[in-house]
Regions:
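Alpha/beta-hydrolase fold catalytic core
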Residues: 1-55, 76-80, 107, 118-119, ...
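Conserved HGGG/HGGXW glycine-rich cap/lid loop of the alpha/beta-hydrolase fold
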Residues: 38, 44-93, 300
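Conserved acidic catalytic loop of the alpha/beta-hydrolase fold
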Residues: 103-121
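Conserved alpha/beta-hydrolase catalytic His-Asp/Glu region
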Residues: 184-252
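Acidic catalytic loop of the alpha/beta-hydrolase fold
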Residues: 243-244, 267-271
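Short beta-strand/loop motif that positions the catalytic acidic residue
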Residues: 256, 262-264
Length: 327
């Protein structure tokens, strides 16, 4: 289970309901992409030269495209990067059909890639985004050059106790109850709670980083649909965990053809470190990076190490493609 950032909120797509502006780092570009029944915010980090292969980054539950701002510039000489705000998260409004299932999120990613004509991409997912990316890679291998999964939310027989509160959000009524019980919590309190849950060592966060996180939390607290998006997405993860047969996530992981990098943190309180070896055995020919001091968001905690492993994956895959006479 996963929860990269806490309360975020806002209504549908009407510009009149939007709150304060979302932060955009130097070198990033933010745009809105309208699809039938769906509007997605895309955070772009253009490659340093023209013609680079495209990459797409997919965040986790409660997260946003900002989760990739530390990693994207470290590989911008290698890929032309874009990070999505999944429907109902970040600066993307809820989907018209209110489908927050893993399949629904995967469908949003596929629809964006098809509409943009960017595939195949180097697909990178964290947590819920890892489950979504696994499903995309399994059902649409033509869209994926390589797959990188950072603490992917894949089913566990014994979920860690620290992940139970996230699962409880899936129970009808619990999200509303939690919202009422925590109404008096400040943005600072919420951010500290998120950091203690998601980081291996919250002291790594700089004062500036903490301030930006608080500002983003304040923005989200002004939005009216956060708890519904969180509850429905949490329910979507639980449903995906219990789904069997050909649609089960582990079964789909076996079908992934793209070269795969798996990243796990030794201090992850949401996705168990012990799942690393099962994942490595399931994704064919995969490589594994374990970071003993990392928590649930290694790309934010140790971006240099993750970038180095991602760079190696992409370079090796390109070498194989060239040797086979591909493009």
């Amino acid at each position: 289970m996963s929860s990269t950032e806490l309360p975020e909120t806002r209504t549908a797509a009407s510009p009149a309901t939007r709150s304060r502006a979302v932060r955009v780092a130097d070198g990033e570009e933010l745009r809105s992409v309208a699809l039938p029944g769906l509007t997605l915010t895309v955070r772009a980090r253009p490659g340093t030269t023209a013609g680079l292969a495209p990459a797409l980054y997919v965040h986790g539950l409660g997260g946003s495209s900002q989760n990739w701002s530390a990693l994207m510039p470290l590989v911008s000489d290698l890929v032309d990067g874009e990070a999505l705000d999944l429907p109902g998260f970040g600066d993307s409004p809820p989907p018209d059909d209110a489908d927050y299932s893993v399949t629904g999120h995967a469908r949003a990613v596929i629809r964006y890639l098809d509409a943009a004509g960017r595939g195949p991409v180097h697909l990178v997912g964290n947590s819920l985004g890892g489950a979504v990316s696994t499903r995309v890679a399994a059902v649409r291998p033509d869209l994926v050059r390589t797959l990188t999964l950072i603490s992917p939310a894949l089913p566990e027989l014994r979920a860690q106790k620290s992940a139970w509160p996230t699962a409880l959000l899936a129970v009808p009524g619990v999200a509303g109850l939690f919202a009422r019980l925590t109404r008096e919590w400040t943005a600072e309190q919420r951010v500290r709670g998120v950091l203690s849950l998601c980081y291996g060592d919250p002291r790594q966060v700089t004062d500036e980083g903490f301030r930006h996180a608080v500002e983003e939390m304040e923005r989200r607290l002004e939005l009216p649909y956060f708890w519904d998006a969180m509850a429905r997405s949490s329910r979507g993860i639980v449903d995906a965990y219990t789904l069997g047969g050909q649609h089960g996530l582990w079964r789909q992981a076996e079908r992934v053809l793209a070269p795969t990098l798996l990243v796990y943190g030794g201090r992850d309180q949401l996705v168990s470190y012990r799942m690393a070896h099962r994942a490595a055995a399931t994704f064919r020919g995969s490589r594994l990076l374990t970071l003993p001091e990392a928590g649930h968001v290694a790309m934010m905690e140790y971006p240099e190490q993750v970038a180095a492993a991602l760079r190696e994956l992409i370079t090796d895959a390109a070498d194989v493609t060239s040797a086979e006479g591909g493009s």
